[in-house]
A protein has these predicted regions:
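N-terminal hydrophobic targeting/anchoring segments and the immediately downstream early-domain regions
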Residues: 1-154, 209-342
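Divalent metal-binding pocket/active-site signature
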Residues: 115-118, 129-212
Length: 342
């Protein structure tokens, strides 16, 4: 049973790689497959605002990265155009509000790293015209713009092209995402940024010492920009052993205590559901596992979006005030997007 408070919430998730699963199908099937496979899960979880990252797997890099980037952006547009009674692709805060008022799920496009753009900073305006409103500049490893998570030993910040990319994103109104950026790169961005940034799917390094998580100093610095940190549900980033639901709640509470309750959101990263949907499972072969990460692991009950009411319930049981739970479940992200996207 869904809690009344969960039904009141503008449940928002800053990271669901469902585009990978949908775009793996022939384009004629995109709208129908989303409606059949993913829409019921989003509705069951009460999701009202969903960020759709465009992630390009190694199979497409480097030669096919731009084509796959455009293909996945097109996939998001086809999903929205083919399901006008259920979802709407939004590029401004006003459009998000209109979608919510119409009872639709608001979708926002993001780029998770930019392998398709490489160092061509001028192409950032192109993807902005296509609807991208959030972007990061690195994933695992090194890019022409910055070193990603796991490359902290290099001590490298943003390259000159990376600095130009940050400036161009701020000019255009694209939100800079620091998730997956190396530690020195995060510090560099926070030094240069003149507008609020976000971490779309990162948890607390104080609780799980993993390079994908943020230190308390980084959490406070993101909050100081006016930004938001969206907690990642992925099991390997929550605990060194098998992650539990309580581990996840600990990360929410820790980030709220360090960054402030107005700077916490959800960036669930339901990897397992995406992996199970992929046909063929090209993204599961070697890539994630070679980095010591099991893409099929998950927190019990949170295999996919349908489990999100459990988070509302869990936060309430931890003693958080209802208003604070509503902020975490999506109120903060909704406010942040309205402020940043206009």
């Amino acid at each position: 049973m869904t809690l009344p408070l969960h039904q009141q919430a503008i449940v928002a998730d800053a990271h669901n790689d469902l585009l990978m699963a949908v775009a793996a199908r022939p384009h004629e099937q995109w709208a129908e497959f989303f409606r059949r496979q993913w829409l019921p899960q989003l509705r069951a979880g009460g999701v009202r605002l969903q960020v759709l990252p465009v992630f390009i797997d190694d199979e497409f890099r480097p030669e096919g990265a731009l084509r796959q980037t455009l293909r996945m952006i097109e996939c998001a547009h086809v999903i929205a155009e083919g399901n006008p009674d259920a979802v709407r692709l939004c590029s401004t805060g006003a459009e998000i509000d209109a979608a919510l008022a119409d009872g639709l799920i608001a979708l926002v496009l993001a780029l998770e790293s930019m392998p398709g753009l490489d160092a061509s900073v001028e192409l950032i305006s192109t993807v902005h015209r296509l609807g991208v409103r959030i972007a990061s500049i690195a994933h695992w490893g090194r890019t022409p713009l910055a070193d990603g998570s796991g490359e902290d030993a290099t001590g490298s910040g943003l390259t000159s092209d990376g600095v130009a990319a940050l400036a161009e994103m701020e000019r255009l109104g694209i939100i800079f995402d620091i998730s997956h950026l190396g530690a020195t790169g995060v510090a560099h961005v926070l030094e240069l940024a003149t507008k609020p940034v976000m971490a779309t799917h990162s948890s607390a390094r104080a609780l799980r010492d993993h390079h994908r998580n943020l230190t308390d100093e980084q959490l406070r610095a993101v909050a100081a920009t006016g930004g938001i940190i969206c907690v990642n549900f992925f099991h390997a980033f929550l605990s060194e052993t098998k992650a539990t639901f309580d581990d996840l709640l600990d990360h929410f509470e820790h980030i709220a205590a360090v960054a402030g309750i107005d700077h916490v959101g959800i960036g669930a990263d339901f990897v397992r559901e995406v992996m199970l949907d992929l046909t063929p499972p090209w993204c599961c072969e070697g890539d994630a596992n070679s980095r010591g990460v099991d893409p099929f692991g998950y927190v019990e009950g949170l295999e996919g979006p349908a489990g999100l009411p459990l988070v509302t319930e869990g936060l309430l049981k931890r003693g958080l005030a209802e208003d604070d739970v509503l902020k975490i479940m999506g109120g903060n992200m909704h406010r942040f997007f309205k402020e940043r996207l206009g």
